[in-house]
């Protein structure tokens, strides 16, 4: 056991030494570089997808030229490098640091846009990919945070070059948030928790009126009211369904769990 621990410890030590050695080497190589040369080299590494080295060069630049405009831009570029390298937490931390240090920076719109992208492009599970990346199965917290980032961008910087794309992504995120609620409503219906299902359906109808889930929400709500022995409410809901979705298949047959795609049973 001691031999194993010694081997592991030695391996970790060697790894740490190698990392430190690389950092020291970068510091030595760049010691006479101007801020412009440092930034240009870091950009070359970033554009070549050498994200780890790009971050190292940005860090060296910021430590040597902390008051330069390149240092401020390097903070944003560091966040982008982490984002491209699938280092979500580091990217978000770098963005928050930039926002805290430079609340009035002219590139704040980009910082908000990048924060939204990091959250928006979170890795998908196998089932999501299998179902053509149905965003309703994403973590609703990530969806909400991404939406808030894009919304802040659009509200604060309506003329930003990123505003149009942010708005389009917000539409998709609203649909996803409605889908999250629908997944829960379906689950409650399947389990016979009709009050809870009705509440979720009403939330979709009230808060996500422009999503593709309203039609099914009305069908779930109608059936839930029937199961709860509330015929008048069920009839009222059906009239709303008929008015807004006159060709709905739910008008000829009531909602049932079999209407759910097979993969949702594992959600």
Swiss-Prot record:
PROSITE patterns (alphabetical): PROKAR_LIPOPROTEIN
Keyword Phosphoprotein: no
Highest rank taxon of the organism: Bacteria
Chief location of this protein within or outside the cell: membrane
Swiss-Prot/TrEMBL keywords: Cell outer membrane, Competence, Lipoprotein, Membrane, Palmitate, Signal
Record's signal peptide: 1-16
Cellular component, GO, one term: Bam protein complex
Protein name, UniProt field: Outer membrane protein assembly factor BamD
Organism: Neisseria gonorrhoeae
Protein encoded by which gene: bamD
């Amino acid at each position: 056991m001691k031999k194993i621990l010694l081997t592991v410890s030695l391996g970790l030590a060697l790894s740490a030494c190698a990392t430190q050695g690389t950092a020291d080497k970068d510091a030595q190589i760049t010691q006479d570089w101007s801020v412009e040369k440092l930034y240009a080299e870091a950009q070359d590494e970033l554009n070549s997808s050498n994200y780890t080295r790009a971050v190292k060069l940005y860090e060296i630049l910021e430590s040597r030229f902390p008051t330069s405009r390149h240092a401020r831009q390097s903070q944003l570029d560091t966040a982008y490098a982490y984002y491209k390298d699938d280092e979500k937490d580091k990217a978000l931390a770098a963005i928050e640091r930039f926002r805290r240090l430079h609340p009035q920076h002219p590139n704040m719109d980009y910082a908000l846009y990048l924060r939204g992208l990091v959250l928006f492009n979170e890795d998908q599970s196998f089932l999501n990919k299998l179902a053509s990346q149905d965003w309703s199965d994403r973590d609703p917290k990530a969806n909400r945070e991404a939406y808030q980032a894009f919304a802040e961008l659009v509200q604060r910087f309506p003329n930003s070059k990123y505003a149009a794309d942010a708005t389009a992504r917000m539409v998709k995120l609203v649909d996803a948030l409605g889908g999250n609620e629908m997944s829960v409503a379906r689950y409650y219906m399947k389990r016979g928790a009709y009050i809870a299902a009705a509440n979720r359906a009403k939330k979709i109808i009230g808060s996500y009126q422009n999503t593709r889930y309203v039609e099914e929400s009305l069908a779930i709500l109608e059936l839930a009211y029937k199961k709860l022995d509330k015929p008048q409410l069920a009839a009222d809901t059906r009239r709303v369904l008929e008015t807004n979705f006159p060709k709905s298949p739910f008008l000829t047959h009531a909602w049932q769990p079999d209407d759910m795609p097979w993969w949702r049973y594992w959600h």
